Amino acid sequence: MAKKIESYIKLQVAAQEANPSPPVGPALGQHGVNIMEFCKAFNSKTQEINKGMKVPVVITVYSDRSFSFVTKTPPAALLILKIIDIKKGSGSPHLDKVGSITRAQLEEVASMKMKDLNANNMDSAVNIIAGTARSMGIMVEG
């Protein structure tokens, strides 16, 4: 028989840097999950991702206080900022442009995000990422 699910916890944690301090500790502690066990498992699973990159994680907590988790790819906005090497997007995106991104760079981000996107092909994925870039005040070229 399957374990009974008690709750889901959604967090964004820096890759390879999970520790018991907030936000991880309080979120898991109130559900009775072994925090250090999660931190070790998460840090080992995110070894291939750049250290410090925020990674969304969905933790499933079961009634016997055990857990499982699924990591997703880093948010598209963070990948875009990293690829064009700027600190943050525009405060008023339709008036102030903070940078530009090429079609090749969009395809690179889309290929990283493809498994988490609701897209059937690469063109659709690129359009989704281009929309994210535009909403951040980044000019899309091509």
From Swiss-Prot:
Gene Ontology molecular function terms on file: large ribosomal subunit rRNA binding; structural constituent of ribosome
Modification after translation (UniProt): One or more lysine residues are methylated.
GO biological process: translation
Record bears the keyword Ribonucleoprotein: yes
One Pfam family hit: Ribosomal_L11
GO annotation, cellular component aspect: cytosolic large ribosomal subunit
Keyword terms, alphabetized: Methylation, Ribonucleoprotein, Ribosomal protein, RNA-binding, rRNA-binding
Coiled-coil segments on the chain, per record: none
Family stated for the protein in its record: Belongs to the universal ribosomal protein uL11 family.
Assembly and oligomerization: Part of the ribosomal stalk of the 50S ribosomal subunit. Interacts with L10 and the large rRNA to form the base of the stalk. L10 forms an elongated spine to which L12 dimers bind in a sequential fashion forming a multimeric L10(L12)X complex.
Described purpose of this protein according to its UniProt entry: Forms part of the ribosomal stalk which helps the ribosome interact with GTP-bound translation factors.
PANTHER family listed in its UniProt record: 60S RIBOSOMAL PROTEIN L12 (PTHR11661), LARGE RIBOSOMAL SUBUNIT PROTEIN UL11M (PTHR11661:SF1)
HAMAP family assigned: Ribosomal_uL11
The protein, known as: Large ribosomal subunit protein uL11
Protein species of origin: Vesicomyosocius okutanii subsp. Calyptogena okutanii (strain HA)
